[in-house]
Amino acid sequence: ILYRLVGSEMCIRDRPGTDLRFSIKDIPAIRCAGERNIPDGECFTAPVKDSVEGHIQFNAETLYHGTVFNNIKLEFEKGKIVKATGSDEEKLNSILDTDDGGRFIGEFAIAFNPYITEPMRDILFDEKIAGSFHFTPGNAYDIADNGNRSDIHWDMVLIQRPDYGGGEIWFDDVLVRKDGMFVVTELEGLNPKNLI
């Protein structure tokens, strides 16, 4: 069904400080089930490059080139990160300024691995946390390409389970996931209790 939903307008909200809107029109959604990464458990696409509007505050620590970052908040206008705050703000902005594509998003992915529930500062695991999604400044993958090119690809994770503040993901006007659990009948099989 995630393939069927491609072409939708996305809206993501959470109580602590995220309100994002973007389009994924004409960009494929890619199912990840162990062909490229182990562990796996995500479906990814990319936003139309200039479509991202709003703000997001990540609640999982992220490790990038040996530096741990906390409480990153990004603000977007016409797809571009116009403000980035958090721990080590100078280094954060320096990384995003690596090149022109560093301030645009190259990936959006919904994660659902039932065996990964807490961040561990290893992005191959953290990006699969059940009830999370990641939003990635930098380079887009060729198989879900929005045209953004960059030397960086920095997966940043927001966990939407109730113990992390909750949140909602909407495709068009349909609530798809609430507080980390899929609420659309066709996607309920991806909830942790159905995958274990």
Regions found by a protein language model. Give the residues of each.
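Single conserved hydrophobic/aromatic residue that forms the stacking wall/gate
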Residues: 1-7, 11-12
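N-terminal small-residue-enriched
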Residues: 13, 18-196
